[in-house]
Amino acid sequence: MKKLKLICVCVLAVLTALTAAGCHKKDEIAVKTGNIKFTSAYYMCALINADKEAKSKVTEELDDDESTEDIDYYSKKIDGKKFVKWVEDTALENVKKIAAYKTLCKKADLELDEETESNVDSYVEYYWTNYGYSQYYEPNGVSKETYAKYMKDAYYSNLYFEHLYGEGGEKEISAEDVKAATFENFVLADKLEADFSSKTDEEKASLKEQFNSYVTALNSGEKTFEEVYKEYNGTTDTEETEETDSEELKPVNKYASVLGTEDTGYASDYFDDASEMAVGEVKLIELDDDAGLVLLVKRDLAADEYYVKNLDLSSRHLLKDDEYEDFIEDYVKKMDFEIINYAIRRFKVKNIAEPSATA
């Protein structure tokens, strides 16, 4: 009789578990506001991204003598919050912000253009296939289609930002202020690098001699940077030929790199060095700990319309990101959200599966 009771209890437990699991539909809604709905898989995508962001923050805050391996993330705090709580709050907050972006864009009759959507699709396809994103998201219930939707929706933020602060926008920033921010936070330089890792002392000496010869040739006018670049990289004109629209704006210095301050998307360790150089000046930097060499040739950013134009939006963000973020946060507070806890609480931060190192 006792055995029969035990069997009945076990069967009941299994049936209960199966029933509970079966109650979660594939496209169940987790967050709603107006006509905008987000599925539980969409929320899970936000949770995974928040978890990655949190772990990155923890790693950045480690002391120099602390190991980056086997970190007990869940024992850490971020901005005064326990790790799990921070991840959960950030994920939900990001979903709400996306709802705000989409709502505001709809009111302003704004939609993503075909080029943006196509670029996102290409990005997703590339990283899903080549960078193991499929092994990260799929085991956690996020399909490629859901990830692509999340990425596209995130672009509504930039779309509305441009609507407000872009040229002709409701809160347009003056061209003078934009250019001032551009020239304050970015410089343009031709850059050639040599990595000394795994190099013998003899190879290092040879590279130093080679780079010093480039400095001499550049300063004397014997060689252009293009010639130096091709010689060092072993490239030819044929290999670099590309078909481009003849009317398309092209850079004056096609080999140049944008070097930015730490607050930009172009943050560079060599920004300060390049900033102090005169246009046309050549400088050879020997990296600390004999890590390598960097050859810089300062270029005139102000004279290169291609780069000035491409840095326009980045400069506007530098000037107005804080204001925009405050505006969105206030807007979110005024929105009515329905949070379906049943659909959200099924996901646990500590249960997020990460791809194995051997995958």
Model-derived regions: residue spans:
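Sec-exported extracytoplasmic/periplasmic mature domains
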Residues: 48-55, 92-111, 125-133, 152-169, ...
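PPIase-associated folding chaperone regions across multiple families
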Residues: 136-206, 213, 265-359
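Short acidic, Pro/Gly- and aromatic-enriched capping/linker segments at domain boundaries
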Residues: 23-29, 274, 279
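Peptidyl-prolyl cis-trans isomerase
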Residues: 213-268
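Bacterial N-terminal signal peptides that target proteins for export
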Residues: 1-8
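N-terminal targeting/tethering segments
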Residues: 25-142
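C-terminal motif of bacterial Sec signal peptides marking the signal peptidase cleavage site
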Residues: 18-22
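Soluble non-cytosolic domains of exported or imported proteins
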Residues: 82-86, 90-99, 111-118, 146-155, ...
